[in-house]
From Swiss-Prot:
It comes from the Eukaryota. It is an enzyme of class 2 (transferase). This is Serine/threonine-protein kinase Nek3. Keywords: ATP-binding, Kinase, Nucleotide-binding, Serine/threonine-protein kinase, Transferase. It comes from Oryza sativa subsp. japonica (Rice). The active site is at 129 (proton acceptor). Disulfide bonds: none annotated. Expression in anthers at the tri-cellular pollen stage is down-regulated in cytoplasmic male sterility (CMS) rice lines. InterPro entries: Kinase-like_dom_sf (IPR011009), NEK_Ser/Thr_kinase (IPR050660), Prot_kinase_dom (IPR000719), Protein_kinase_ATP_BS (IPR017441), Ser/Thr_kinase_AS (IPR008271). GO terms for molecular function: ATP binding; protein serine kinase activity; protein serine/threonine kinase activity. Belongs to the protein kinase superfamily. NEK Ser/Thr protein kinase family. NIMA subfamily. It catalyses: L-seryl-[protein] + ATP = O-phospho-L-seryl-[protein] + ADP + H(+); L-threonyl-[protein] + ATP = O-phospho-L-threonyl-[protein] + ADP + H(+). Residues 354-413, 489-511 are annotated as: Disordered. Interacts with PLIM2B.
């Protein structure tokens, strides 16, 4: 008591008095609550000691601040708490003088009170005396809940049955002598909110029995209509007769109408960044500088290590994905074509020398990731076209003729030695999937020319022979492609001499061999009835074959020239039939 200076008495009750004091050292005002123990029942004494112990343990921004407590001469329990300059809520209601509070302010107060009660209920504490005179306002009009003289600590979620509190704020279950729990505080808070909203008590009567009847029946006058329906519904939900139907403090804080205010309070209550006094700024700055120096040192060591690793990797011939632009300036200045050519040469050499397993067993192309390693794996296959373009025409022709994407029925691989065929197969596996998967193969057929008749690599006595292919889907596609080429050429056949080899497509048709006898056999004389009969017979046989295999689309294309209004349809179809029969189809 010697540390405080008494300024004035600000309150008095049946159990004691409240004094406004000033701390002699801090020069800050506090409230000294003196609870008289003399001439009091044992229950009142226990209540005073309980309040002293409880208020010392409670720490919440919306509960009155605890400063100190002691027992003076065995006659008084002294509790020093924070001083609220704004007074209590009952005084604020009187000062309002029938001027309603704004809904925003009431919602803010409600959220603060709910946070205080939720803190107490989580810690199994019942206030049991929530009323307007125990709700205090700070200088900034913020809420502080006080007076824990009737509070009770429960060991768990048990209920209590003691009849304590202010009658006009008592809940129906307490008046009915039914055990009650934390929902009794929600009822009392609803009565406070009703009074703060309507500026009059929720339940008022001249005698105790009438008050009990009104509370038991939960008879309430309507709330002012200036407030929103959601806000009025919140207050009504807190004043429901059954405690099971009342929401808890935590549930009310989750109500959508109160969420903006909850968020605002959470932002305000976040800890400030500059909480250190001025005397510690020098030491903090020194620590920060030391930390920055250590971080920069470790970071520089990491960068040096990366550069060293990249240099070692460069010397060993392995590309590094962690290098910087400064380390690779010379590499970036080098033309991309040279880089791709070098990489392709290296990969092809490895493949030819026997390192086939890494190429042939590589997985299918997957979606490109952020790392650079998959990108390097795919580069050889993408750049192989550029490398192949630099080879001599004769070699390029042979290599392309052996690829499965050629879609020609000429068995060029029969002309190659086993060594050349093996190399061609390996190079074919390196081909990019863009040729055979992503792009139409029909468009790629024109890019694979047949070796010229004067090619030095071909044996002079060896002739290209036409072998009848098997009836498969691949041969079907080849026949279809050949059919389209021959059809475009045959349209020119009617405007010129039909015996001209250039008109018959000898330059572009991959089915033409190097034999002069074969060229003579390919010529079709329209005046020869024998050849026309053979052509028609071949047309019927081929049509029946397509019909038997249910290849109706190709059958429709074959019979389309026989439609009405076509220019020389019969000659075209007969010539095509002759061609198909000559190929063994």
């Amino acid at each position: 008591m010697e540390q405080y200076e008494v300024l004035e008495q600000i309150g008095k009750g049946s159990f004691g008095s409240a004094l406004l004091v000033r701390h002699k050292v801090e020069k800050k005002r506090y409230v000294l609550k003196k609870i008289r123990l003399a001439r009091q029942t044992d229950r009142c004494r226990r209540s005073a000691h309980q309040e002293m112990e409880l208020i010392a343990k409670v720490r919440n921004p919306y509960i009155v601040e605890y400063k100190d407590s002691w027992v003076e001469k065995g006659c008084y329990v002294c509790i020093v708490i924070g001083y609220c300059e704004g007074g209590d809520m009952s005084e604020a209601i009187k000062k309002a003088n029938s001027n309603y509070f704004s809904e925003e302010r009431l919602c803010m107060w409600l959220v603060q009170l709910l946070m205080a009660l939720d803190y107490l209920h989580v810690n199994h504490i019942l206030h049991r005396d929530v009323k307007c005179s125990n709700i205090f306002l700070t200088k900034d009009q913020n809420i502080r809940l006080g007076d824990f003289g009737l509070a009770k600590v429960l060991t768990s979620d048990d209920l209590t049955s003691s009849v304590v509190g202010t009658p006009s704020y008592m809940c129906p279950e307490l008046l009915a002598d039914i055990p009650y729990g934390s929902k009794s505080d929600i009822w009392s808070l609803g009565c406070c909110l009703y009074e703060m909203t309507a500026l009059k008590p929720a339940f008022k009567a001249f005698d105790m029995q009438t008050l009990i009847n009104k509370i038991s029946k939960s008879v309430l006058a309507p709330l002012p209509t200036i407030y929103s329906g959601a806000f009025r519904g919140l207050i009504k939900s807190m004043l429901r007769k059954s405690p099971d139907h009342r929401p808890s403090a935590a549930e009310l804080l989750k109500h959508p109408h109160l969420q903006p205010f909850v968020l605002e309070l959470q932002l305000k209550s976040s800890p400030a960044r500059n909480l250190f006094p001025d005397t510690n700024k020098a030491s903090c700055s020194d620590d920060e500088n030391n930390w920055k120096a250590k971080y920069s040192k470790s970071h520089s060591f990491k960068v040096d290590r990366i550069v060293k690793v990249d240099k070692v990797a460069a010397n060993n011939g392995h590309p590094s994905s962690t290098g910087t632009a400064k380390d690779y300036q010379e590499l970036l200045k080098q033309p991309m074509d040279e880089l791709l050519g070098q990489l392709t040469e290296k990969v092809v050499d490895e493949v030819i020398h026997g390192n086939h397993s890494r190429v042939t067993k590589s997985p299918a192309p997957t979606p490109r990731r952020a790392s650079s390693t998959p990108r390097i794996r795919l580069e050889p296959s993408k750049t192989f076209h550029a490398r192949a373009a630099e080879t001599p025409p004769s070699k390029c022709s042979l290599e392309r003729a052996s690829q499965p994407t050629r879609r020609a029925s000429t068995p060029v691989n029969m002309l190659q030695t086993p060594e050349k065929r093996q190399g061609a197969d390996i190079l074919t596996r390196l081909k990019s999937p863009d040729v055979s998967v992503n792009s139409p193969r029909i468009d790629r057929i024109a890019e694979f020319p047949i070796p010229s008749f004067d090619d030095e690599q071909l044996h002079p006595t060896t002739k290209l022979k036409l072998y009848p292919p098997s009836i498969t889907d691949q041969s079907i596609t080849k026949d279809k492609c050949t059919f389209q080429v021959l059809r475009s050429d045959s349209s020119k056949n009617h405007t010129g001499d039909s015996s001209d080899p250039s008109i018959l497509g000898t330059d572009s048709n991959p089915l033409i061999t190097s034999s002069s006898d074969w060229m003579k056999q390919r010529r079709f004389d329209t005046t020869s009835y024998r050849q026309r009969a053979e052509a028609l017979e071949g047309l019927l046989e081929f049509s029946a074959q397509l019909l038997q295999q249910e290849r109706f689309e190709e059958l429709g294309i074959l019979l389309k020239p026989f439609g009405p209004g076509k220019a020389s349809p019969r000659e075209t179809a007969i010539w095509l039939s002759k061609s198909f029969k000559g190929t063994g189809l």
